[in-house]
Amino acid sequence: MITKPDKNKVRQKRHRRVRGKLSGTADRPRLNVFRSNTGIYAQVIDDVAGVTLASASTLDKEVSKGTKTEQAVVVGKLVAERAVAKGISEVVFDRGGYLYHGRVKALADAARENGLKF
């Protein structure tokens, strides 16, 4: 009997493979994206110190209305503004094993437009 692969397990495997190749430093931290069915979360992480430097998600009060893609744009804008306020201008983009399409792409484009370089 053929079993259908679990999409999330395949994504996690892809994410582990990519994470082995990229890491965030204090000079160039990692912009991590997590996408759930209902929301999207973004963190700017310094992997050397193991510290989250800035974050934004659909749980924030500023992000409440609109479609999921519109919310992703607002989250990208917020995380970029918070990172730039802390003096971070360059990051390494970690798409979390997700395809660079839809909400993930919308978040990345909004972060670029608001001052983050990657």
Curated annotation (Swiss-Prot):
Key words, A-Z: Ribonucleoprotein, Ribosomal protein, RNA-binding, rRNA-binding
GO cellular component terms, semicolon-separated: cytosolic large ribosomal subunit
Disordered, as annotated region: 1-25
UniProt superkingdom: Bacteria
Compositional bias annotation for Basic residues: 10-20
GO biological process, one term: translation
GO MF annotation, one: 5S rRNA binding
Biological role stated in the UniProt entry: This is one of the proteins that bind and probably mediate the attachment of the 5S RNA into the large ribosomal subunit, where it forms part of the central protuberance.
Protein family (similarity comment): Belongs to the universal ribosomal protein uL18 family.
Quaternary data: Part of the 50S ribosomal subunit; part of the 5S rRNA/L5/L18/L25 subcomplex. Contacts the 5S and 23S rRNAs.
Protein name: Large ribosomal subunit protein uL18
Species of origin: Streptococcus gordonii (strain Challis / ATCC 35105 / BCRC 15272 / CH1 / DL1 / V288)
Organism classification: Bacteria, Bacillati, Bacillota, Bacilli, Lactobacillales
Gene name per UniProt: rplR
